[in-house]
Amino acid sequence: MSEYKNALPRLHQRYEDVLKKQLREQFGYANELQVPKLEKIVLNMGVGEAAGDQKKLDAAVAEMTVISGQKPVKTLARKAIAGFKIREGLPIGCKVTLRRARMYEFLDRLVTIAMPRIRDFRGLPANKGFDGHGNFAMGIKEQIVFPEIEYDKIDAVRGMDIIFVTSAKSDAEAKALLKAFDLPFNG
């Protein structure tokens, strides 16, 4: 039997071995289960042009699959908007929810490979993006920052939203957790 069969992703191992203890000391938790943890990462890509051309949505789904390693689900319009030629129930985007090993592997690639490739990147805003309940949302303007996407094979540059859902009770706890995972906050 291989010793790597049940190996944890690098960041998950670091969380279990080092970060849990650090966060417990920093916030003075009495119980180890109180320590905030990353529960899921949601990637969302809105494709407005999909209303007129479903091929654009299919291309976005393919790109999201390559980036996340998991097939996304198409999101449907909740209500009709005549000005944008959108009918209720029309597919206009895609999203994928990453948990467990895939979540930690995506976070590792995001922090070590994708973020350094963002042009004029000076870090994430320290006080924006938190929702007051321990979750953090950020946006990426170009999907080409991920090395899995080949620049020659894309039809359009698309952005995406990345939402980090944590078990933290406050924004300060969530920020400390994400900072411990090396997310580059500028403040």
Curated annotation (Swiss-Prot):
InterPro entries tied to this protein: Ribosomal_uL5, Ribosomal_uL5_bac-type, Ribosomal_uL5_C, Ribosomal_uL5_CS, Ribosomal_uL5_dom_sf, Ribosomal_uL5_N
GO terms, biological process: translation
GO CC terms: ribonucleoprotein complex; ribosome
GO molecular function: rRNA binding; structural constituent of ribosome; tRNA binding
Listed PROSITE patterns: RIBOSOMAL_L5 (PS00358)
SUPFAM superfamilies cross-referenced by the UniProt entry: RL5-like (SSF55282)
Keywords: Ribonucleoprotein, Ribosomal protein, RNA-binding, rRNA-binding, tRNA-binding
Superkingdom as given in the UniProt entry: Bacteria
Function: This is one of the proteins that bind and probably mediate the attachment of the 5S RNA into the large ribosomal subunit, where it forms part of the central protuberance. In the 70S ribosome it contacts protein S13 of the 30S subunit (bridge B1b), connecting the 2 subunits; this bridge is implicated in subunit movement. Contacts the P site tRNA; the 5S rRNA and some of its associated proteins might help stabilize positioning of ribosome-bound tRNAs.
HAMAP family xref list: Ribosomal_uL5_B
PANTHER family found in the cross-reference section: 60S RIBOSOMAL PROTEIN L11-RELATED
Record-stated family: Belongs to the universal ribosomal protein uL5 family.
Subunit structure, as described in the record: Part of the 50S ribosomal subunit; part of the 5S rRNA/L5/L18/L25 subcomplex. Contacts the 5S rRNA and the P site tRNA. Forms a bridge to the 30S subunit in the 70S ribosome.
Name recorded for this polypeptide: Large ribosomal subunit protein uL5
Native source organism of the sequence: Gluconobacter oxydans (strain 621H) (Gluconobacter suboxydans)
Origin organism lineage: Bacteria, Pseudomonadati, Pseudomonadota, Alphaproteobacteria, Acetobacterales
Gene: rplE
